[in-house]
């Protein structure tokens, strides 16, 4: 297992480089003048003409040279200093928010992670529990009802369901506002006496014993959590039900019942563990998707996460920000897939990772 994990970690940089090279190559399909127009807002006014911009940033260099400069930095012709470079911790300047990309992501990633964590609790819990319940009561009333709910949830587009709950619970009832915090809670969070531990407001509020801020942050999370949890819960329920039905037909469960084991023991100790492989696969991919930022959901609810940042960056042609998000997303995806593969070995000893 240790050798397998080490080997996968060694592959991680190769995958990240491959993803960023692909995006960089797509960006390089634009002419130097077109690319200069994308970055012109990053350049001080004294730079002048487009030719000066192209010369300063080497936009007419070969693609591999430009990629190398993006990774390790580029020496400034005037000062001789090396500027930029992903390996030096500099992802460039974001014109979308007017600040360094790394600084923006340091605020956006915790926000997206907080949303993903809270959405994963009902999604995974209800998805697996109700999926097992549906399979155990196959073709009975409860199975039919759960199947209808799962089909409805899986078929409704995210933006439609999000707008529906937003109109009902915010526009009409005024219960759960969009955004991340109320104005009064933001003032408390930004005060000198408030200590920031994780940049996740719900967890930081608990650590600061600010329970009113915790409730306010949680209230702002209700609608995006509901949207993400229901839509993904529906798919996870269907996968769990299908996997459990396959396992429940196996003869070893008949043998377990013949030995006098309670049905609950048969289901939880013998059936469910053997049905977890596809559940872990789907659940892991869904969770990785949530951590990468859910663009539509964050945009609908005005939630300042990585997904909404990516949407705004794409709309404003902020290529540097898009590259930064792609770099982080590829890291999350590779590490998430590694975690899923490792969980296979713990759940099912028959799987040997060699």
What kind of region is each of these model predictions?
Residues 1-62, 102, 106, 124, ...:
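N-terminal signal-anchor/first transmembrane alpha helix
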Residues 2-3, 109-114, 118-142, 158, ...:
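Alpha-helical transmembrane segments of integral membrane proteins
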Residues 12, 74, 112, 116, ...:
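Short alpha-helical functional segments enriched in proximate histidine and acidic residues
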Residues 16-72, 169, 173-213:
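Hydrophobic alpha-helical transmembrane segments of membrane transport/permease proteins
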Residues 26, 30, 39, 74-75, ...:
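Hydrophobic aliphatic residues
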Residues 27-28, 69-73, 147, 166, ...:
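Generic alpha-helical structural context detector
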Residues 37-38, 65, 80-83, 90-94, ...:
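Short, hydrophobic secondary-structure boundary micro-motifs
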Residues 59-128:
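An internal, D/E-rich "acidic patch" concept
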């Amino acid at each position: 297992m240790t050798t397998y994990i080490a080997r996968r970690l060694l592959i991680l940089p190769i995958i990240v480089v491959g993803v960023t090279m692909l995006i960089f190559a797509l960006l390089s399909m634009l002419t130097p003048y077109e690319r200069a127009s994308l970055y012109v807002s990053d350049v001080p006014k004294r730079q002048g003409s487009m030719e000066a911009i192209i010369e300063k940033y080497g936009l007419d260099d070969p693609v591999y040279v430009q990629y190398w400069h993006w990774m390790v930095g580029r020496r400034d012709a005037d000062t001789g200093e090396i500027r930029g470079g992903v390996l030096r911790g500099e992802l460039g300047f974001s014109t979308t928010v007017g600040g360094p990309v790394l600084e923006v992501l340091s605020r956006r990633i915790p926000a997206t992670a907080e949303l993903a964590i809270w959405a994963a609790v009902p999604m995974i819990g209800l998805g697996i529990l109700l999926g097992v319940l549906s399979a155990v009561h196959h073709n009975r009333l409860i199975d039919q009802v759960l199947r209808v709910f799962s089909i409805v949830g899986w078929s409704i587009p995210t933006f439609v369901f999000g707008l529906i709950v937003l109109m009902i619970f915010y526009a009409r009832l005024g219960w759960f506002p969009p955004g991340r915090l109320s104005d009064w809670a933001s003032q408390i969070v930004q005060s000198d006496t408030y200590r920031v531990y994780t940049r996740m407001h719900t967890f930081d509020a608990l650590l600061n014993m600010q329970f009113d801020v915790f409730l306010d942050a949680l209230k702002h999370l209700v609608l995006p959590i509901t949207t993400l949890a229901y839509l993904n819960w529906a798919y996870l329920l269907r996968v769990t039900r299908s996997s459990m039905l396959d396992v429940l037909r196996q003869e070893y469960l008949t043998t377990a019942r013949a030995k006098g084991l309670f049905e609950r023991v048969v289901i939880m100790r013998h059936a469910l563990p053997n049905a977890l492989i596809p559940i872990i696969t789907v659940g892991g991919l869904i969770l990785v998707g949530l951590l990468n930022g859910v663009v539509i959901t964050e945009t609908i609810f005005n939630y300042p996460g990585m997904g909404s940042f990516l949407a705004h960056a794409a709309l404003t042609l902020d290529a540097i920000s898009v590259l930064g998000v792609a770099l982080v997303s590829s890291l999350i995806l590779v590490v998430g897939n590694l975690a899923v593969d490792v969980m296979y070995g713990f759940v099912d000893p028959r799987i040997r990772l060699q």
